[in-house]
C-alpha cells in the first residue's frame, strides 16, 4: 500500500497509478482535487479527523461490469467545489458492484447548489451499498439519493441536513416511466438526525427529511432512535439573496 501522505494531489492523480487496496493517508490540512477522482479500484482514504483534514472536490466510484469497487473513507471532510458535477460529491455510477464506507466523515456541499452537484452521495448503480458511521452530510439538495434497484443504505449516527436528507428516485432505472414494482432496496438507520432544508423561495419549496417517492416501490426502511426534523421558512444559507 501507499501508506504515505498525499502531499500533492496533482502528483498523486497524474503521476501515480493507484493499485487495488491502496491506502492514501492525508495528514492534517486542506487539499484540493484537481479533477473528479475516478475510482475503478478499491482504495482507502484516511484523514486526521473530520475537522482536521479537508479535501475539496468530488469522487466517482465506477466499478467495471462483473467486478466490484469499494471506497473506504475515514476521518475527513469532503467539500464540494464543482457546480457542474453530474454525480454529487460522491457518485456511485459503475456497472458492477459499487461499495462506499464512510466513518467519522463529513460531506459538505459548500457553495455548490446545482441539482445534481449538491448531493452528498448519488447511488446510481444497481446493487450499490452505502454505509455511514458517525458521518454528517450538509448539502443543498439531496443528502443521499437512492436511484436504482437492489440498493442498501446503512446509517449509524450522524446528522443529515439537505432539501431531502434521504430521497428515493426512479431516475436511474430502465423502465421508460421510471416505475418498478419492487426495487428490493433496504434502508436502515439508527441514532441519526435527518433535517429538511428549505430550498429556493421559502416554505413553498420545502421538501422533507425523508422522501420515499411513489414510483420507487418495494423499499424496506427501518429507523431506530432517529429524529426527523422539518425546518420552517427561509433557509439562510440558500436564501440569503432571495430573502
Regions found by a protein language model. Give the residues of each.
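Short, polar loop/linker segments at the starts of domains and inter-domain junctions
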Residues: 1-9
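N-terminal extracellular ligand-recognition/capping segment immediately after the signal peptide
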Residues: 10, 20-44, 49-58, 78, ...
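A structural signal for beta-strand register positions
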Residues: 30, 49, 77, 106, ...
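Right-handed parallel beta-helix/beta-spiral solenoid domain characteristic of secreted/periplasmic
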Residues: 43-93, 106-119, 190, 196-198
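All-beta strand scaffolds that present successive hydrophobic residues in beta-strands
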Residues: 44-47, 71-75, 99-104, 129-134, ...
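Residues in short coils/turns that link rungs of repeat/solenoid architectures in beta-rich domains
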Residues: 52, 80, 109, 114, ...
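Structural detector of coil-to-beta-strand junctions
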Residues: 58-60, 70, 85-91, 117-122, ...
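Predominantly polar beta-repeat domains that present long G/T/S/D/N-rich surfaces used to bind, process
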Residues: 196-197, 202-243
